[in-house]
Amino acid sequence: MSTNTVPTPDDEGPTEWIGDLEVRRVSGDIQEHADLSTRSKARKQALDILFEADLIGTDPLEVLAARPGVFTNPVRPFAADLVRGVAATQVGLDSVLTDCLSEGWTLARMPRVDRILARLGAFEILHTDTPNPAVISEAIELSEEFSTDDSAPFLNGLLGAVITHGPARVEDQPSDDAASLTCPAPDGGSEQPPITVDDVGSMASSSDSFPAEVGNVDTTSGNASDPENSADDFELTGGEHPTSKDHELATDLHKKDTTDD
């Protein structure tokens, strides 16, 4: 993978290529690119990319790689970090979020944009040192712009449960690597070796062993469809038929992304 040091709008160091797209290198410290003045726009851009990937049922990294080049509409470094981080840890994130939902509710039955915002928020809570109130505030702000009236209180409760009951965040783990997370063994035995945000393949396969003994948040705010009326064979990725509202939202997200400086 080739690297160079050509300056770009958010340049903080060497870049790397993801397909034909030149983006900032993701370091061991996910916070390297979390500049306070740009991270809100970066989260919106990450939401756009992850939403599109979920909509068409493809790998978020493929959508990231297909985005315009650096001189037309650059992918913000922190947005790339978030997309790659969520893609690397999605199995574990979904496990934690599912355990924090009340009985009978699933991620698959949540509105698509809320599901993506929940993953983004859970990733920042569990894998970065972004202050928890800031994570929830950003998720609420984006939900108010792109989702339903019920989404803000729903996400507030869900992410609050992740903070209270979810696995300890990265900085609380007994590890020298600030971006690693030690997961308990599935059989209750000794802990598995730490896994890192950089190791996309191994993290995606190992992060399904988060603790399940977490409290549930009441999600009866009307933000998700009635579980009694939902198909049991629903698949989270690629099995959800996009609605006209989904396509309108995808267009709106992308339009805002391309016009945001």
Curated annotation (Swiss-Prot):
Domain of life, source organism: Bacteria
SUPFAM superfamilies per UniProt: NusB-like
Tagged with keyword Magnesium: no
GO cellular component term, pick one: cytosol
GO biological process: DNA-templated transcription termination; transcription antitermination
Compositional bias ranges of the Basic and acidic residues kind: 242-261
Protein family per UniProt: Belongs to the NusB family.
The protein's role, per its UniProt record: Involved in transcription antitermination. Required for transcription of ribosomal RNA (rRNA) genes. Binds specifically to the boxA antiterminator sequence of the ribosomal RNA (rrn) operons.
Protein name according to UniProt: Transcription antitermination protein NusB
Organism: Cutibacterium acnes (strain DSM 16379 / KPA171202)
Gene: nusB
